[in-house]
Design a protein with these regions (language model features):
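Long, positively charged leader/targeting segments at protein N-termini
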Residues: 2-42, 49-70, 77-81, 125-433
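Eukaryotic helix-linker segments that join adjacent hydrophobic helices
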Residues: 74-128
Length: 433
């Protein structure tokens, strides 16, 4: 494929303060598609299509592969147009849309707006470098599957997740485009906020974004408020250039936030030497094949990460978050639907890990989340009063005290959930032949 659009992307990004290492180039990998690698020959600094005189060298440890200024990021924050370093560079959305839609949905519509703005968009070179709405084969996620493709995921968690995502995204799109079509001053856009464009924008965010918590307070340069929305909400953010490396859980990289020097930016640094000619990967954390296929459009053969999902009610989610902060020091699971990983071999055991061996097969936070979901009234009141009493960290909490019945229930639910998933996979496989 032609890499000209990536040459334009790099030129535009560098003009606005972005950086790409001189030993790094963009190339078209036959297996992975557009990727980054350490220069394999005397070719262009940034594109595997020209020639120059730079020697072949490995990429040393701690080297910065790429960096992107926060001012070049694209998200809901730009649509707000409230922060000097996060401007919209576009017509501001109607106040009603900004008030009633969730941050991630507004971000999706903002990307659609940039696509419709075409050459006049501030992010035009970036948008043109992305897989385009008509390039369904490059997008590759289950929402672009044919009927023949869907037959292969029938009966699996992926089929359920695909159907739920399509339903949710369509609902979000309908709410948003109705507001835009009915808003004064937006008449020329009527009919252009199509489902295909919204699905494309949401897919771009699901497959290439970083989380909003990576943007530090120093970037805002003013008190942080969203009106009726909370900054505790986590939403996706696109960072041009940073989304070029492909994902690998084996990649040893660091995401470095710079707020001391201008431009304030986010960088990807490698932790070990990468020989010339080798692809440079990013690491978005361990993910199951269900998550990878749903969000990115690929899976990893032999991946030991499986996932189980639960959809807690709002009250339950608040209790789960409170307990995870007290027990684990962080939130675990998705913001609306708790998704946790399960492995056939135990996770690495920290020195202070006193969990049952069976509990070490599931990701931190899973057992405690299930404990909340399966608790009776007495047990839930106890959890609220004692958020730091974590059954995942104490054998005493499992077999003694007020939560012993609850933990036995958790083990039963985990077992049933995994057996159900295994049965569905075997059954579907038999029908496929």
């Amino acid at each position: 494929m032609s890499l000209a659009r990536f040459e334009n992307l790099i030129s535009w990004a560098r003009h606005h303060g972005a950086y790409i290492h001189e030993q790094v180039e963009v190339y078209d990998d036959p297996q992975y598609g557009v990727s980054l690698r350490v220069r394999s020959s005397q070719q262009s600094v940034h594109l595997a299509s020209h020639s120059d005189q730079l020697p072949r060298q490995s990429l040393p440890p701690t080297a910065c592969v790429v960096s992107c200024p926060f001012s070049l990021s694209l998200s809901y924050l730009n649509a707000l147009n409230k922060f000097p370093d996060l401007q919209s560079h576009s017509a501001r959305f109607p106040a009603l849309l900004l008030e009633v839609l969730e941050p991630h949905v507004i971000g999706h519509f903002f990307l659609v707006q940039q696509y419709l703005d075409a050459d006049t968009s501030h992010w035009g070179p970036y948008v043109r470098s992305l897989p385009q709405p008509e390039e369904s084969g490059k997008l590759g996620t289950p929402l672009y599957f044919t009927d023949a493709d869907i037959a292969w995921i029938r009966g699996t968690d992926l089929e359920i997740a695909r159907d739920q995502r399509e339903k949710t995204w369509k609902s979000d799109w309908e709410r948003g485009h109705r507001i835009l079509d009915a808003s004064s001053g937006w008449e020329k856009w009527n009919g252009k906020w199509t489902w295909d464009l919204y699905k494309w924008a949401a897919t771009i965010f699901s497959s290439r974004s970083f989380i909003s918590t990576l943007i530090p307070e120093e970037v805002f340069r003013m008190p942080v408020t969203y009106g009726t929305k909370s900054f505790d909400d986590i939403f996706p953010v696109l960072f041009p250039l940073l989304d070029l490396p492909n994902h690998s859980t084996a990649a040893k990289v660091t995401w470095f936030t710079n707020v001391q020097n201008e431009p304030k930016d986010l960088s990807i640094l490698v932790e070990s030497e990468i020989p010339y000619g080798q692809q440079i990967f990013n690491n978005y954390a361990p993910k199951s094949n269900t998550e990878l296929m749903l969000g990115y459009g690929f899976c990893i053969p032999g991946n030991d990460e499986a996932s189980i999902a639960f959809k807690p009610l709002r009250e339950e989610l608040m209790i789960i978050r409170q307990r995870h902060l007290a027990c684990l020091g962080s939130h675990s699971g998705d913001s609306k639907q708790s998704i946790f990983h399960v492995r056939s071999t135990p996770y690495t055991r920290p020195p202070d890990d006193t969990r049952l061996p069976e509990f070490r097969l599931v990701e931190d936070g899973c057992v405690d989340a299930l404990a909340v979901l399966t608790a009776n009234r007495r047990e839930r009141e106890y959890m609220i009063q004692h958020p730091s009493r974590c059954p995942e960290r104490s054998l005493e909490a499992v077999f003694m005290g007020p939560l012993s019945r609850n933990i036995l229930k958790v083990m039963a639910v985990l077992s049933d959930k995994l057996e159900e998933g295994l049965h569905d996979i075997i059954s579907t496989g038999q029908h496929l032949g």
